[in-house]
Amino acid sequence: MSDITNEKKPLNSDPEILLRKRRNADRTRLEKQELARQRQEQRKKEQIKNKKKFIRAESLVANSLATSREKERIKRISKLEHKKLKGDVSHLPSEKNFFLKVTEKPQSEETDDLIDEDEEDGFEREKVAYNGEEQLLFVLRVKGPVAASIPHKAYRILSTLRLEEVNTAVFIKLTETTFSLLKIIAPYVIVGKPSLKSIRSLIQKRSKIVYKREDEEEAKEIILNDNNIVEEKLGDCGVICIDDIIHEIATLGENFTKCNFFLQPFKLNREVSGFSSLNKLKKLEQREVEKKTRKVSNASTAPIVQIDIDALIAKIN
């Protein structure tokens, strides 16, 4: 008679903590689906409401004229760049592209003597030729010309740079090709050369990535504050921590593109927000400053305005 061994077999069940996680995940998924359905219904209601909204004839005319001017500006730039590629630049005073650096004039330098017309508004302007070397630029998306719809070509460039939303920003590597793209989207962005301090501040405070954890079904946006995630995603490139990402971006290293697209576009604050009397006054002052620093030209050879981006980052970061 063979010996019968009564071995204790483990129950075919999952631990309580795993069941709780699954239950929470199911509840979260259902809540997200319900929110998505509500947003879709709200969007449909707004579309129906906008269709019935009365629009004045003056608004239609203003929108049409502003959009036509913007399309004509882009057409001129595209035509000029095409001629440059063909070498037909005999009609141009210079083949180079230019920056117009606009900086606030230090108060200590203000005197009662006669000053140039460019400096009467408190800003110094310097036109600098672009030498074709690779440079790091910080590009911030802002509102474009009043009443103008964004032309398709400009919107495609903004989408490629991941700048569909206002007050989002990215780092880009400036080359001859990207300079031409910046000329097309110039009215919709603010451009500047960031310092290492600003780069470090942005990445440490505002950096987010899309990451999928083991216990999650879908990838979601999280704050980047774990070097283990950096090593997991970028370790093959020799980038193992956040400081390595800062170094690659600041020095335009060989892994600049991978590190840059690993980060989501930076979502920054508004320079002035709120509806109090003081904030309304600040908004008026901000508009006056923008009129002086962001003068948009419809000329195809207009330089790209470059501002003191470090001062702006300190305000909105």
From Swiss-Prot:
Pfam families attached to this UniProt entry: Ribosomal_L30 (PF00327)
Gene: RLP7
GO annotation terms (biological process): exonucleolytic trimming to generate mature 5'-end of 5.8S rRNA from tricistronic rRNA transcript (SSU-rRNA, 5.8S rRNA, LSU-rRNA); maturation of LSU-rRNA from tricistronic rRNA transcript (SSU-rRNA, 5.8S rRNA, LSU-rRNA)
Function recorded in the entry: Involved in the biogenesis of the 60S ribosomal subunit. May act as a specificity factor that binds precursor rRNAs and tethers the enzymes that carry out the early 5' to 3' exonucleolytic reactions that generate the mature rRNAs.
Places the protein is found: Nucleus, Nucleolus
Keywords: Nucleus, Ribosome biogenesis, RNA-binding
Species: Candida glabrata (strain ATCC 2001 / BCRC 20586 / JCM 3761 / NBRC 0622 / NRRL Y-65 / CBS 138)
Family of this protein: Belongs to the universal ribosomal protein uL30 family.
Domain of life: Eukaryota
Main subcellular location: nucleus
Stretches for region Disordered: 1-50
Protein name in UniProt: Ribosome biogenesis protein RLP7
GO CC terms of this entry: cytosolic large ribosomal subunit; nucleolus; preribosome, large subunit precursor
Gene Ontology MF terms in the entry: rRNA primary transcript binding; structural constituent of ribosome
Biased composition, class Basic and acidic residues, residue ranges: 1-11, 25-49
Disulfide links within the chain: none
